[in-house]
């Protein structure tokens, strides 16, 4: 079971990240897990730390330095998405990189779960509703679509 763990480089709450990895594995009854991680600060490095501390294999995907940074990260994330059986997104709702991962999961029909970090519960619900609304466009949409998702989620907040 290849579990792609990804999220914002700004999320550094080790206890929260560890708990979400464990929750995801338990909820889905995953066995023989290998963590796929992209060697980025934040969630990636902490997911690797969790794996090592639990004796779980890690497959590392460093960005290819032949490309510019943004393209290298996208290519690396695309490779991890293609190779995963499930993706765990630990997202603050702002990271374009994690949004890119959501889009890639939609593009390649990969199952995923999003846990929101440091967002009020009503915004988490609104994001979930908005992502569902945009689902058919996510796979082919530009990463700037995140701005539309935010705008729509805020409209839902204002109407409640």
Residue positions per predicted region:
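Short, charge-rich amphipathic interface segments used for partner binding and complex assembly
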Residues: 145-160
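Acidic/glycine-enriched connector segments
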Residues: 11-124
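N-terminal acidic leader/helix
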Residues: 129-138
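Charged, low-complexity interaction regions
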Residues: 138-146
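Residues that mark the start of a beta-strand
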Residues: 1-4, 34
């Amino acid at each position: 079971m290849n579990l792609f763990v990804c999220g914002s480089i700004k999320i550094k709450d080790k206890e929260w990240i560890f708990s979400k990895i464990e929750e995801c594995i338990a909820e889905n009854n995953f066995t023989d897990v290998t963590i796929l991680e992209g060697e980025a600060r934040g969630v990636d490095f902490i997911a690797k730390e969790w794996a090592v501390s639990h004796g779980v294999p890690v497959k590392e995907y460093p960005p290819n330095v032949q490309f510019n940074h943004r393209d290298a990260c996208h290519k690396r994330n695309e490779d991890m998405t293609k190779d995963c059986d499930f993706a765990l997104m630990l997202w603050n709702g702002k990271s374009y990189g994690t949004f890119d991962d959501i889009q890639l999961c939609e593009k390649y029909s990969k199952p995923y779960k999003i846990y929101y970090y440091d967002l009020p519960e009503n915004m988490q619900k609104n994001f979930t509703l908005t992502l569902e609304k945009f689902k058919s466009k996510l796979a082919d949409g530009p990463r700037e679509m995140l701005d539309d998702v935010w705008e729509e989620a805020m409209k839902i907040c204002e109407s409640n």
